[in-house]
């Protein structure tokens, strides 16, 4: 899946880039990544206008004061809540032990092909899982680690292999994969197996990558040779899914969806205490896009006050706490396992409760100002 061009505009947002410095987490929790981006860019614009537009300095000073009031009112309320616990804030003290199994691919990349690639990817993941020596609460296999002839939902031999490891490790499993549906379609799934070896439920990816997981207007574009690399169109899932793991709740988003705040926030609203991103980043190559994706996961972890588990088939995989700190991560194009103890969290932030309310407020105010100027003129 060549996700590079489709995701590039999302990666450029200021709020995702600045998480590399872990700046002002309270702003992320109050306004979210997009709100943070709006604030930084608007402040920059106001400063430039104030410096360059001598005739309108009073107007821009007044606009700046209004803008600062709009920023600091909700931010002050959040900081007040942080001090006096006005919102429900319940960080569970019990940790869960989690393992990311990063099985890699023998021939990563959208255009690369090798014999029995899918079978070899599955075998790598099952063999790495067999190397885990002690019991764990949750084992995670990333996107594309199973599927087609190695789908646990369809092929009993695959489910049996996994059930043996479930029993040995007394673990829940969350497993990514894709499933052909007739000749023209497929599903991209996250399959949840409980610690008794039963397939409990699955999450189906809702947001396909344009020209990577489906071809818009395929019937009119079939003459383009390179589109043969995408022979099937993904069937969209309908909603978020919450998986119950004992007393804890987790949810998955799949790959490209991790670029969009609404899927992670939607899972938090549905009750998720841990967010898992299943992804296949093979087409990113040695570029910086794997690191950029982790930055996005960090921004979303801070904004929603949730730990995020970033599981990538070819790397980089990472454990990220609710403050956006990377606890541990893997390298690119390696076969390895990554262990961490994670604290489930079920508190709320202004962003997780109200979404991009600040952005909409600014749009409404701008529209009112526009109408007022039209009336006065």
Where in the sequence are the language-model features?
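Hydrophobic alpha-helical transmembrane segments in integral membrane proteins
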Residues: 67-101, 109
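Single conserved hydrophobic/aromatic residue that forms the stacking wall/gate
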Residues: 1-7, 11
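Structural signal for the C-terminal ends of transmembrane alpha-helices
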Residues: 47-56, 370-376
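Juxtamembrane membrane-water interface segments that cap and precede transmembrane helices
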Residues: 14-27, 344-346
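Membrane-interface loop-to-helix entry segments
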Residues: 26-42, 351-361
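Solvent-exposed soluble domains appended to multi-pass membrane proteins
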Residues: 112-118, 138-377
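Membrane-interfacial entry segments at the cytosolic side of transmembrane helices
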Residues: 56-70
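Hydrophobic core of alpha-helical transmembrane segments in multi-pass integral membrane proteins
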Residues: 46, 68-82, 360-371
